[in-house]
Regions:
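Extreme N-terminal signal-anchor transmembrane helix of membrane signaling/transducer proteins, especially
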Residues: 1-23
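Juxtamembrane membrane-water interface segments immediately C-terminal to a transmembrane helix
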Residues: 22-47, 58, 62
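Extracytoplasmic ligand-binding sensor domains of the Cache superfamily
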Residues: 49-103
Length: 182
């Protein structure tokens, strides 16, 4: 009986560890979605800055570059199970941004404006990929937890059945026999 209970405890420990790992990675997903979503607004703001106050463009480019290279976005790229679509989307944004930042530095407002809608669509695609990945991880986590709970329930049910068969019934028989002897 002790062996079975020990297996249940080990199994619960493994499940808890896996769940914590998945939940920890989901925490960074929300931050990645927020930062990548802010890239859209920042790129539009940069266009406005180019038109109204060109002397602040370089400062805004640095801020944008910091957001684009945020640690959480780089971490998503290196996650073991990150889909190739996320990685490709991020690389596409990085490549496109090189061109967009060149337009901004050269104050080529028309070229920047002409590419902006397409660039923002690429950012939207990246955000959508991040959201889908986060949703998949959440579904996997919930599925693993449900299956694990069912397995634990099955193991505990087996232990209870085993105890009834191997411990309770023999004790009942011994009690009956001792009552008959008395």
């Amino acid at each position: 009986i002790a062996k079975y209970l020990f297996v249940v405890i080990i199994f619960m420990g493994i499940i808890s560890s896996l769940s914590l790992l998945v939940m920890a990675s989901n925490k960074s997903d929300a931050e990645a979605i927020n930062i990548s979503g802010s890239l859209r607004m920042q790129s539009y703001r940069l266009l406005t800055e180019m038109e109204r106050s060109p002397n602040t463009v370089e400062q805004n480019l640095v801020r944008y570059q910091d957001s684009l290279n945020a640690n959480v976005l780089l971490t998503v790229q290196n996650q073991l199970f990150a889909p190739s679509g996320i990685k490709a989307s991020y690389q596409k944004i990085l490549q496109r941004w090189m061109m967009m930042s060149d337009f901004a530095r050269a104050h080529q407002i028309e070229k920047y404006h002409a590419e902006l809608k397409s660039y923002v669509q690429d950012v939207d695609d990246f955000v959508l990929e991040l959201q889908r990945f986060a949703e998949k991880k959440w579904i996997i986590a919930v599925s693993v937890l449900c299956i694990s709970m069912l397995l634990i329930l099955a193991m505990v049910s087996y232990v209870i059945w085993y105890m009834k068969r191997e411990v309770v019934k023999p004790l009942e028989l011994m009690t009956k026999a001792s009552m008959q002897v008395q």
